[in-house]
Amino acid sequence: MPIIESSQSLLLDKDKLKRILLTIPSEPGCYLMRDKNETLLYIGKSKSLKSRVRSYFNTNNTALSPRISLMVRQVYDIEFILTDSDSEALNLESNLIKEHQPYFNILLKDDKKYPYLCITWSEEYPRIFITRRRRLRNSEDRYYGPYVDVTLLRKTLFLLKKLFPLRQRPRALYKDRTCLNYSINRCPGVCQRLIEPDDYHKTLKKVAMIFEGRTDQLKDLLHKQMLIQSKLQEFEKAAIIRDQIKGIEQLYAAQKMTIPDSTVSRDVLGLSIDSNVCCVQLFQMRAGKLVGRIGFVYNSLELRSELILQKVLEEYYSQIDNVTIPPEILLQSSIPQQSYFEQWLSELRGSQVKIVIPKRKEKAELVKLVKRNADIELERVKDGQSKHLIELEDLTQVLDLAFVPRRIEGYDISHLAGTEVVGSQVVFIEGIPAKQHYRKYAIKSSSISSGHSDDYMALAEVIRRRFRRWSKYKADGLDLTELRNKKLSSLDPLIITDWPDLIMIDGGKGQLKAVEEALRQLGLDSDINVCSLAKRNEEIFVPGSYNKLDTEKNQPGLLLLRRLRDEAHRFAINFHRKKRSLSMKRSQLIDIPGVGPRRIKSLLAHFKSVQAIQLATEKEIASVEGLGTETASIIFKYFNPIERDIV
């Protein structure tokens, strides 16, 4: 049960709290706060552990924010780790938070999960590609970004792969010959080792210079190489280099934001704040050019602006792996313990990093520019929140709810004549898709099969699986009506946020009735608000009424439900198509003698498609892990039943 009893909090066990406080030294280090179940709630640092930890439990301390106050009421045990210095404590704290990700350490979130560009220098023939995931810091790979405009990033990479012969595939398409990319000069033939690794590295280093902002240096280098090739009368090679220079110039023709000090790389942070929203913009300037920008948005403001900037530095630079930390960071205001942050960042970078609050005109103007971008972003966020609030308030009136539905879940079923039946759960929080909470359901009911589809039964199964544990909580004595508060100190915050204020079903009265019955069987029919949205005429139905609700076509609440319904449909149909595609691949292989599910899985993992298996040689098939020459021969002959000798 997620309920905290009196003996499960240090606030109510004064003897244990006193013993813990007596053992904590007045030295720098990190402290780790855990609940009764040893779940890590919070990780912090201080130059004096004793005074910092004691401050959480002062009886007259009204300075704690509601979030931290909620956390303190759940603390049952405290651990500490001593360090030699404040900067070492900062480094340790960042690593611990990154590893454990405690619930109450979450401060900021990216307003999007921005992509990076990665060059895999750890490989003999490095690849270059766009990614949203990053490897460990000790890897040799290099990351550039993050980039706000992923479309522009894709176009840039596409152009560079046309200008420079680069590795195009993560693995070779053929074992004994090159692919089409080599024939059209898009790849130097790395799969067959037709170029030496050192020569390939030289080409890739030129591309890396572009993402480091050193385009002027690269153009100078290419210009010198072009002149050398011309003198050697290698006019074809000189023409290729000339085209590369022109392509680079076109690539950066639209880059208007530059600064006079074109030799320095720096990050510039600007912050805009109001009563309950904070926006931070981080601009990456490399050799005088803007090469990347990222935004942070934080709601439920509880910290001063300088502390927010401090937290942004901590979280951003500790969580980015192998992204270049610049030698200079410009801020609009000073932060606490600035010298320790400089030392910490210098250790991460491997050379000196300075944090500067600029006074000079050029740098100060740059900070003001970033600050103006943060102001604009803040207004955009507030306008969006205002729009979503109007929709939520209108939906509250349409459905006659007692409160505004902050978390709404949408459900849909997708199948093809009863095959590969799947369900989807999508979640909107404050009117915005929260994709981290989406869930997929593969329907397990034996009553649903090819030619015997039953959307009602499938929906009922999804609802039972989604709310089964809540039915158990209620049976164990949890009052679910208390969940409306969302801030109860007696409940685990992660459990609280999983409870919906409203669920919407894609369908009409029949689908709604099936869900009602499933909730009744769980004993939750009186605890969850439910509605359905029928595609025909966009009609809303609610339990206890046979008639549709009276709504206007473009009513804000209806528009919100339509977005939710369409998102649930999209998510369900994509999952169904993926399962159907995999099933079709498997069905084409299942008839081959001696090939079972395990070997099918190995074949598809190696070749990616049935078509690739059909085109493979017997030797290539035999190279698949788990297949012998005999099975490989059977598979090859299955797809190639007649072999003709060419005389």
Swiss-Prot record:
Compartment(s) where it occurs, according to its Swiss-Prot or TrEMBL record: Cytoplasm
**Chief localization class?**
cytoplasm
Annotated GO molecular function terms are: DNA binding; excinuclease ABC activity
Per the UniProt record, one Pfam family is GIY-YIG
Q: Which InterPro entries did the record assign?
A: GIY-YIG_endonuc (IPR000305), GIY-YIG_endonuc_sf (IPR035901), GIY-YIG_UvrC_Cho (IPR047296), Hlx-hairpin-Hlx_DNA-bd_motif (IPR003583), RuvA_2-like (IPR010994), UVR_dom (IPR001943), UVR_dom_sf (IPR036876), UvrABC_protein_C (IPR050066)
Biological processes, Gene Ontology terms: nucleotide-excision repair; SOS response
> Which residue range or ranges hold the GIY-YIG domain?
26-106
| Domain of life (superkingdom) | Bacteria
Matching PROSITE patterns: GIY_YIG, UVR, UVRC
Q: Under the cellular component aspect of Gene Ontology, which terms does the record hold?
A: cytoplasm; excinuclease repair complex
Could you confirm whether the keyword Transmembrane helix appears in this record?
no
Query: What are the UniProt keywords, alphabetically?
Result: Cytoplasm, DNA damage, DNA excision, DNA repair, Excision nuclease, SOS response
Membrane-spanning intervals of the chain:
none
Domain called UVR: residue spans:
216-251
Residue ranges the record marks as coiled coil? none
User: Which PANTHER family does this one have?
Assistant: UVRABC SYSTEM PROTEIN C, UVRC/OXIDOREDUCTASE
Summarize subunit and interaction data from the UniProt record for this chain: Interacts with UvrB in an incision complex.
Family statement: Belongs to the UvrC family.
Q: What does the record give as the function of this protein?
A: The UvrABC repair system catalyzes the recognition and processing of DNA lesions. UvrC both incises the 5' and 3' sides of the lesion. The N-terminal half is responsible for the 3' incision and the C-terminal half is responsible for the 5' incision.
Q: What is this protein called?
A: UvrABC system protein C
What lineage is this protein's organism placed in?
A: Bacteria, Bacillati, Cyanobacteriota, Cyanophyceae, Synechococcales
From the UniProt record, report the name of the gene that encodes this protein. uvrC
